[in-house]
């Protein structure tokens, strides 16, 4: 909510990506075909566009995540919120995006520092889904599927399905090891669902889950 997505799109993507004002965030790519596969009105209240510093602060305040000692950083259960955001070294577009994420944290009282390991180290850590991610990988970037004949189902599966949790070598997705039985059931049912209304309802529910629980979030199209 607090991230300056227009800056990411302008700098990291050299304006070669739709903005979230133009195409509100969901689980779909920005093409008309995929955008028609869910009910945008049903999730409109969840589709933040970014740069909403005051809105993000208000949510944190409401949740009781406040700066109780006046040092400028918020705490939760007595612990200062301090995270490391990371992506591979030398991936300049990703690094530019990660710096914007870190800057957003500071604006709302969350300490986010950046670190850029070499790709060989990074990919070994992130794709190991049979153990919790180690220190230094609190926030990290990876890719998701683009257009293709199995989309948007394939992309959603790789973002949300718990089937990848526990894999010693996971190049598929869900690298944050998210698990939601309702999402799993919807994903498993989609390939055999043929009724257009049922498909749209299922995709809409998956978008709602994704935007409500935020197991990950998109920085750019």
Regions from the PLM with identified roles:
Residues 5-8, 80-82, 107-111, 134-139, ...:
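Loop/turn elements at helix/coil->beta-strand transitions in domains of secreted/extracellular proteins
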Residues 12, 87-89, 116-118, 141-145, ...:
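Active-site proximal loops enriched in glycine and acidic residues that flank catalytic Cys/His/Asp
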Residues 117, 137-156:
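Ligand-binding clamshell of periplasmic/extracellular solute-binding protein-like
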Residues 1, 9-10, 19-21, 49, ...:
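Extracytoplasmic/peripheral linker and loop segments enriched in polar/acidic and small residues
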Residues 36-46, 127-133, 166-170:
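Surface-exposed intrinsically disordered loops and tails
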Residues 76-79, 131-135, 181, 210-212:
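Extracellular/periplasmic catalytic domains that process cell-envelope and extracellular macromolecules
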Residues 99-108, 121-137:
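Short helices/loops that flank or line small-molecule/ion binding pockets
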Residues 1-103, 174-179, 198, 205:
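Append "and occasionally in soluble cytosolic enzymes with long acidic Gly/Pro-rich linkers
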